[in-house]
Design a protein with these regions (language model features):
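Short, well-structured hydrophobic secondary-structure segments
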Residues: 32-52
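Short, well-ordered alpha-helical segments
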Residues: 30, 74-85
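Preference for long, well-ordered alpha-helical segments
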Residues: 103-124
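Generic structural signal for well-ordered, non-transmembrane alpha-helical segments
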Residues: 54-57, 61, 86, 112, ...
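Short, solvent-exposed, charged loop/turn and helix-capping segments
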Residues: 62-78
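Short, small-residue-biased leader/transition segments that mark boundaries at the very start
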Residues: 1-3
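Amphipathic, charged alpha-helical scaffolds that flank and support histidine-based chemistry
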Residues: 92-108
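Solenoid-repeat scaffolds in large eukaryotic assemblies
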Residues: 49, 56, 104-107
Length: 124
């Protein structure tokens, strides 16, 4: 499958996905970008590491921007999630600055925890 076929397939998945699935896809993308950044860092490819962490930060910012506290049953929980996403983005900025794999791992673990909870509330 060539690159253009993958893009078409990705666009089809996004256009057909439920809002819940779109959030899952963003989280999966964030985790993938962080894994790619770690791989680039281990190879000494600092430019690629920066690019992948930048994309992970954009994804986390997108998740944060998608929060709707006014529609939540528990607005305080949304505020805590907002603060967590903010923390995650800041940690990735710092991880990028100092080339720290442990910081990337920390954010990956946090995002996995959030994703596990999100996956558990999937609509039936």
């Amino acid at each position: 499958m060539c690159s253009s076929d993958l893009k078409v397939n990705s666009h089809a998945q996004v256009s057909e996905a439920s809002p819940h699935r779109l959030v899952q896809m963003l989280m999966e993308g964030g985790l993938d970008r962080m894994a790619q950044a770690k791989g680039a860092l281990s190879r000494g490819d600092i430019a690629q590491k920066g690019l992948m962490l930048g994309k992970a930060i954009e994804i986390i910012s997108g998740l944060r921007d998608g929060l709707e506290p006014e529609k939540a049953e528990d607005p305080a929980a949304i505020q805590r999630l907002d603060a967590l996403y903010n923390y995650m983005g800041n940690r990735l900025v710092e991880a990028n600055r100092v080339n720290d794999v442990e910081m990337i791992d920390e954010v990956s673990r946090l995002l996995i925890t959030v994703k596990t909870g999100w996956d558990a509330i999937a609509p039936q």
